[in-house]
């Protein structure tokens, strides 16, 4: 992965969380945030000038906050709506990331977001993968970008 891709992932992810979910990243990722396990995730595959997938993983407190902020809801939100809200965030984030990677040049096709099984989460990085962790008052999120080699 090129350094320019690495540079673009964090600011693009942070801006998407801010603009779509109204969650504002912490200045520094704390030890407490890093210790929080991921309890939910979505994966969005894409193809076009570059192909791969983007994963968004989140700790327990993040998804209710995303859902409440995106839907303007107060209090407990249906688990299916939480899954849908995280999927929509993953979809928008994927679109923003692929556009930033290619400076808006080219057409990309995104597959629908798919829920991920937390039992399958790994902290190990794969070849051609970039990963950023983002801390929030509500917990932390992780964005992982996998590019296919072709």
Identify the function of each model-found stretch.
Residues 1-150:
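N-terminal auxiliary interaction/assembly segments of multi-subunit proteins
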